[in-house]
Structure formats: structure tokens, C-alpha cells
Amino acid sequence: MNFTIRKRKNKMNVNSEQIQFDAAVVVAQDQPLTPNGIFEALRHWLGQKNVSKEIILDKSVIVYNNSKTKIILLAKCITYLGNPHPIFKKRIQLPEWYQIFCNNIEKNKPEYDVRFIGIYHYNGNIVFVDFIKACF
């Protein structure tokens, strides 16, 4: 399945280690997904009927709905940490509003759970990482 890749504005990107589908490691450019690509990847792997976009507390968020609970997926791309770090180091950059949003959800919408999801993509290989909220 092909997902939309974000076009890089900065042509000074540094190559870093990438994981191929067969688990081989190559050195190449990151291939972060667009916000819509993230949404489509989540829908593809979690089920079209289970994943939707909703406005909750004035924020447009992705919601995973299983039969037990609604989980807000605050998802961002995993990319290279940048120079001067080793080429295997990756990161996820979480916007400041994520923490405020989580605190507001706990107070105002306790029926929801919130997850920080990192999405790594390279040549069709997708890896999802569920981060621990308490570390944010």
C-alpha cells in the first residue's frame, strides 16, 4: 500500500539509517508521511471502520474505536534526530499542545484514552511505536 510521503523543503537533509521490509538496514533519506498519509496508514492497519477523524476539545484528532473504548491517537512521524547525532538515532517531535490536550482529556473526557503514536515509514515499510504518556 502506498501512502503520501511529505516533500522535504530543506535540501540539506542528511542520510540516516532506514529499515527495509526485510529488516535490512540501508543509509538513505527519511520518508515521513503527510498527516493524511498517517491517517490512511492507521486506517489501513487498524481497520477502515475503526479509525476516524473527530473534533475533540477544539482539536482535529484521529480516533480508534474498538468495542471497548475510544482511543485518541496523537500520531507523528519518526525521523532522524539530525546532526551531530549518529545516523541510527530517530525521534518523534510532539507539539506542545499534546500535553495540554492530554490533561484536558483526563479532566473533561475520561471516556477517552490518549496514545502517542510514532510512525516510521521507509519504502512501504511501516513501524508503529506506542510511546508511554507519562514520559512526555
Residue ranges and their predicted role:
Residues 1-136:
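Intrinsically disordered, charged low-complexity linkers and terminal tails
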